[in-house]
Amino acid sequence: MSDLETALSLLQNKLRRQILERLVREPHYPMQLANLLGVSQQAIVKHLKELERGNFVMKMKLPSEKGGPPRTIYSVQQSMSLRIDLGPDLFSVEQRSLPAG
């Protein structure tokens, strides 16, 4: 699957788009996302793994403040633009990378 096809496939899911909406603002733990979006942590983790495979997000292990096992936090990994032009005698889909920030 091409990068464009991967991006379109991943973004067709509404929950994944909602997850990305939160992660572009700031990194989150899966449980935070589950609480914010009103779905199970298991569902969030499943979608985060898909987004990670597509290089949309990355995970980092942070030490626990209470001395427990490290906690996993997710953040957006890349800046990109998808553009779809559609009309009579017109169909164009374009993906391009954007500078970070």
Across the structure, where does each feature detected by a protein language model lie?
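Key DNA-contact positions within bacterial/archaeal DNA-binding proteins
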Residues: 42
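Conserved segment of winged-helix/HTH DNA-binding domains
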Residues: 65-101
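Short capping segments at the starts of secondary-structure elements
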Residues: 14, 25-31
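Alpha-helical residues within the helix-turn-helix
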Residues: 35, 52-53
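Residues within the DNA-recognition helix of helix-turn-helix
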Residues: 47
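Short helix-coil-helix linker/hinge
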Residues: 9-16
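Beta-hairpin "wing" of winged helix-turn-helix
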Residues: 53-68
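Short, Lys/Arg-enriched N-terminal segment that forms or immediately precedes the first helix
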Residues: 1-8
